[in-house]
């Protein structure tokens, strides 16, 4: 948090004087015993705040981490969170929101901030919705305008072509698909924007839990396709927001 923002939060009563002194005295991170070293300086250093990977964390650790952000009135996103984990956090911090399908907890103090640019999130099938939601919620949390285009896979390519003019207006496109994952390549052949491809684990046996989709996207014959890890909607959205932010700044 920069000093100007800190002063404004003190004046508005969002944080106490003691909490402000703690922020001024810290080294950019907060050591929570044996649990975590929270990187509060990450937003200043990288442009976006730290994220919490919830899946492998015990309840006590997860609550302590979210509580540290809450006490500073800092926004944070938690990925791969179960409904039970959300309920545990919600008991302590009432301000958190949750998407059960997207498996994301958000503590967002910047909901009303103006969004910038435009990211198109294009997913092949309804089964890809959890990954699509993870990407959508993350991108909105990180400050981007987002438009979603769902169930427009190549098995019914007319559905994609019907939306292609809208998709072309975006600064960057996230393409999400399982099975043979042809969507990213088809899109790349139709637009002049960079594409971040997300292979999903959706598919029958030879899909190999998303490996087939991953290799298909990596081997795309169309230029301009970069690929993130299997089911990694968060990672795709983060990268897309970095690019979107640069484009939005350049257009001013």
Label for each model-derived stretch:
Residues 60-62, 128-133, 157, 177-187, ...:
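Short glycine/serine/threonine-rich phosphate/pyrophosphate-binding segments
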Residues 104-106, 145-166, 211-212, 228:
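Glycine-rich oxoanion-binding loops at beta->alpha junctions
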Residues 162-200:
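Glycine-rich phosphate-binding loop
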């Amino acid at each position: 948090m920069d000093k100007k923002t800190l002063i404004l939060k003190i004046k508005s009563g969002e944080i106490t004087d003691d909490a402000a002194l703690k922020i001024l005295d810290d080294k950019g991170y907060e050591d929570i015993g044996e649990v975590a070293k929270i990187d509060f300086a990450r937003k200043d250093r990288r442009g976006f705040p730290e994220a919490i990977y919830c899946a492998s964390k015990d309840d006590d650790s997860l609550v302590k981490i979210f509580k540290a952000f809450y006490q500073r009135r800092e926004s944070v996103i938690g990925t791969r969170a179960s409904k039970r984990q959300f309920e545990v956090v919600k008991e302590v911090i009432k301000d958190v929101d949750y998407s059960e399908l997207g498996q994301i907890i958000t503590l967002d103090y910047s909901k009303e901030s103006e969004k910038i640019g435009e990211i198109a999130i294009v997913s092949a099938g309804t089964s890809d919705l959890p990954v699509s939601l993870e990407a959508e919620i993350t991108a909105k949390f990180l400050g981007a305008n987002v438009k979603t285009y769902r169930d427009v896979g190549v098995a019914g390519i007319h559905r994609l072509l019907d939306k292609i003019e809208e998709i072309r207006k975006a600064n960057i496109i996230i393409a999400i698909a399982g099975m043979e994952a042809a969507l990213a390549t088809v899109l790349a052949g139709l637009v002049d924007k960079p594409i971040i491809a997300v292979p999903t684990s959706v598919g029958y046996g030879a899909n190999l839990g998303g490996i087939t989709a991953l290799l298909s996207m990596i081997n795309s014959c169309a230029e301009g396709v970069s690929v993130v890890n299997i089911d990694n909607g968060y990672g795709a959205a983060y990268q897309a927001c970095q690019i979107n932010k640069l484009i939005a700044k350049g257009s001013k």
